[in-house]
Amino acid sequence: VLSQVDSSVGGKTAINSPHGKNLIGAFYQPSLVLADLGSLATLDPREFRAGYAEVAKYGVIDDEPFFHWLEKNHADVFARGDGLTHAIATSCRSKASIVARDETEQGDRALLNLGHTFGHAFEALTHYDTPRLNHGEGVAIGMACALRFSAYLGYCASDDAARVEAHLKSVGLPSRIRNISNWNFTAEQILDAMYQDKKVERGALTFILARGIGQSFIAKGVSGEMVLSFLKDELGR
C-alpha cells in the first residue's frame, strides 16, 4: 500500500545517509506505474496499516471529504473491498496533482511531508529499526503530533487534532510517542534529530501544519523553543 500510494508517484529516488532520511537523491520520472491491488491480498496486516497512514495523510492535507469518507469506510478498505480501489486511486490522484504543480519540491510539494518532520526524527532515533517502528507508523505518530502542534500554536481546533488521532487509533495505528517500543529519548534529542530534516533552511525548522483537516500549510522558521516545549508536553502524556 505504501509504495502504491506514495513512493511510486512523483519520481523521487533517494537513499538514507548517516545524517538522516532521504537526504541523497534525484528526480527520475518513470514511463509507467502499475499498481496491482491483487498483490495486497497477502500483505502483512501491520504493513497494510502502515501504508494506510499515507492514505489518511492525503485527506488531512487538502481533502476533508476524503478523510470523512475514510472514517466511514475504512473497514471496507481493510477488508480489501471496493473501498480499497477508491482509496488508492484517490491517493494517487491527490499526490499526482500536487507533484504536477511542483515536481522538484520548491513549494507546495512539501505539503506531502505532513507528519514527516516528526516521523523521520522518530525513525532516525530508533535507527530505522522497522520491527520497532516502521515508516508508516512513524508518519501516523508524526501526523497526529503535527495536528496537536498546530492546535498548540493556535492554528487549528483541538477537536481536529483529536479527530485525526481517533481515526488513526480506530485502524490500529499508533498516535503517541509513548506507543513506540522502548522509547527512551528526550525532547532535546528529538529536536536535534529534527534539525537534520531536509526541509531545514539556513538552520531554521520547517513544519507542515494545519488550520484544520484538509487545510495544511507550510510553516517556515518555526521556533525551536516552541517545538521543544511541545515535545516535553507530548512526552509527559
Where on the chain are the PLM-derived regions?
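Active-site segments that bind and position negatively charged phosphate/pyrophosphate groups
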Residues: 68, 72-188
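Short glycine- and Lys/Arg-enriched binding-loop motifs that mark or flank ligand-binding interfaces
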Residues: 2-7, 16, 111, 115, ...
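A glycine/threonine-rich phosphate-anchoring loop and its flanking beta-alpha core
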Residues: 1-75
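C-terminal charged capping/lid subdomain of soluble metabolic enzymes
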Residues: 53-55, 155-237
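A generic hydrophobic-helix recognition signal that picks specific residues
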Residues: 22, 29, 108-109, 205
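Short beta-strand segments
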Residues: 27, 34-35, 113, 208-210
